[in-house]
Amino acid sequence: MTPPSATGPAPVLLAYFSRPGENYYYGDRIDLEVGNTEVFANKISDLIDCDVYRIEADDPYPDSYDETRDRNVREQEENARPVIANLIGSIDQYQTVLLGSPIWNVRPPMIMSTFAESFDFTGKLIHPFVTYAVSGLGSTDETYAELLPSADFGESVAIQGETVTDSGADAEAWLRRIGLLA
């Protein structure tokens, strides 16, 4: 995680989960060195002053698309809470949280539920961002509203994974709409 800002207003936290490896790509598969959500998170962090925290599974997800899909289905069926490696100690200093993930089977991966339930988000402004192959935002807004009933929610954004490398203008426009970029 990048260190918190020493001066100025409460910093923004950009917390995201991303998986490199074999990914869906226009009906086929492609191997990614950097996951799509991380690519978009980097575009955001290049544009605004924020603290960046990458959510990582204690038991990493496989590089194989099929194995990851199967594990995700099991986790969703079991309502699992995968353990996060190196969970940050606190989010108290943040008023705004940009919460990023891929969409797996129409919702954020279950590790995002682990993260959401690990902290008190009361009064914090949450702006979800996701990358997807088919489902757009899926049930992202509903999922987080259920997990974080005491949080406030701003605009979400969904970026197609296949186009994420060209999404700089999308990141800039979204950050302007939510008031984080002048």
Model-derived features: positions:
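Structural beta-sheet core signal
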Residues: L14-Y16, V52, L99, P128-V130, ...
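Glycine-rich phosphate/pyrophosphate-binding loop and the adjoining helix
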Residues: D152-A182
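Short, well-ordered secondary-structure micro-motifs
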Residues: Y25, Y65, S139, D166-S167
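Residue-level detector of flexible, active-site-proximal loop/helix-junction positions
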Residues: G21, A57-D59, A133, Q160-T163
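Hydrophobic pocket-lining residues within nucleotide cofactor-binding pockets
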Residues: I55, I103, I159
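Helix-loop-strand module that forms the ligand-binding subsite of alpha/beta enzymes
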Residues: P60-D152
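Short, surface-exposed alpha-helical segments at coil->helix boundaries
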Residues: V34, E38, N42, P109, ...
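N-terminal beta1-alpha1-beta2 submodule of the flavodoxin-like/Rossmannoid cofactor-binding fold
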Residues: T2-Q95, V106, R176-A182
